């Protein structure tokens, strides 16, 4: 017990007194790796499955909508408990941190089990709803069935990872994700081509990799390498605790939930043209997501710093954390956009050697590059509100990119501009979200971070 207290005090001192640039870099570099590895799960699947057929490649995009639903609840519960934990540790309330972490873990596993049962019972209509055509449907069903079975483990892993990040142990969080990601890349070609399992092999590789990540993350807690202790006795029986977790995590649930909705709408809009169009937007979205995942990774380093320092009353360090993260994220976005804009055809060809897929995907990538430089700012304004407990504004901002702004655009632009309208809907929503975020950031700094 004394070692635990000393560890907690040392961590609190680090979060409150280490220079902000050095602190955020130390936290965000592991989370960057974690985010990239997380995207790598799907990107590796897309790459190897694309070698089977264009319809199989499109199926990955359809099931991505389903995975976004699972991630919505896993990330939402994880972010909710993570924000409470970082503020609790900043205020020296370790018992509350233990209670929230333990409760969130059990809650996430239960939600994942419910999603698994509901998804398996409605699999075929669900796949059609998410954008499957008759030719895509068999591939989508094979892939989704195995992913659904892994849902409880996936949701619980997101909580374990967020608890470690919330206490400032981003490196420990990274270990599990990195090992799982590397395993996924190795298992994909083995199961798909050597064992001739096809697209089901890609799903099995992802599920097993998620299980390995879960076991590695759980080992950190079982062997006392974390500040927060997960114990069955600490699981809360108070609805108020679960309500708080959901309230703080609700912006993330909205953001990821709308991501699922937007992906389904995009798939359906593209399916009106061809399977090649669905495959093209699937691949271009994976590339776009690689850059966005880096922005989110930096933000996951920023959030515990903001939570600790705001909880301890250090407003100047909270402001500095926001601006440093925004600058760093913008530089990453500009570099990513420049690289993609230079080689759009080569990137598309790397995934699928289909001239029609390359033509459509190239256009989508160039539209995305045009708005990448403004993504970091709007993302961190949203995360600032969320991690400091301003739930209503955070939910509104989280709903803009993939919901309030995107849904009207994806319903309107394809009718006006055809396939080009499908490709430009998400970039247009990203730019409008940036404009909406500006007054929110100005207000917050004037009224909550002054002094």
Model-derived regions, located:
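Small-residue-rich hydrophobic transmembrane alpha-helices
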Residues: 57-117, 154-173, 267, 280-344, ...
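Transmembrane helical elements of multi-pass membrane transporters/channels
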Residues: 26-45, 146, 180, 209-213, ...
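Short runs within selected transmembrane alpha-helices of multi-pass transporters and secretion channels
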Residues: 78, 147-165, 173-181, 202-217, ...
